[in-house]
């Protein structure tokens, strides 16, 4: 869960009434990812030992699915460690998907940078640029979904527009 705080020195911020929409499933989000995505090949290849551990984790499951003689995780390990995404449900929050080992729903590996971006609702042409794969992965993890970003942008632009132009019909804000 994320908390967004918007403060204003120019007046009270009015939030529009929220409408609840059914979020995309992991399968729906990943369906649009193909080789044309900019960071398509930015992926961590796990060791053979790690792939063996991953093979035990069922969709929606986590490290607890791994037999103790293979696992090496303690009882206080967080539930999102070695978590395989369920293809038929919305994704969990993607914090650092590399460090937590957030698993692809069908393959024994973590998500690629482009797959994580697609789950966040980001577009194909958005580029994560760094010499470091882990830095690219962290860039995605540090973000918010595109829907949240657009919502915050529109709330802030509306207030700035009202402050600058008043609440007239000549408003300059374009909601995307």
What positions do the PLM features span?
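S-adenosyl-L-methionine-dependent DNA methyltransferase catalytic core
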Residues: 2-176
